Amino acid sequence: MGRDAAVIARAAGIDVPDSCRLLIIDVKRDIDHVFARTEQLMPVVPLLRAKDVDEAIEWALILERGLSHTAGIHSRNIDNMDKMARAMNTSLFVKNGPHLAALGAGGEGWTTMTISTPTGEGVTCARSFVRLRRCCVVDNFRIV
């Protein structure tokens, strides 16, 4: 954790250039692989090989473990994107982009890392933490 991809690769006995920024490990069809089951806080990405989009969505549901936080898909098929978004039912769902796009980094939304996303309230903004007030006037200022 917290190491460059090249440092991690060399520790594993793999020779890569210093400019290497990402390591992709092919875990084939093993959804029980430690890299598939554990959040990676390093530049190592597991590659799972599903037979089709339905199996990939099924695996994503298993691996997300019902946390309802974040999921995403890269696809040109809008039906597949819709199918996965509905199945995952996460607070943040990103189509064809990095997951940080859901927090305003190249996408839409606000950059707010709070506990609100997995509990269903969604992302927060400054307005989430202030008292909203309503002012109402009766009779006067009625312009017809």
Give the role of each language-model region.
Residues I14-V144:
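Conserved C-terminal structural/oligomerization subdomain of aldehyde/semialdehyde dehydrogenase
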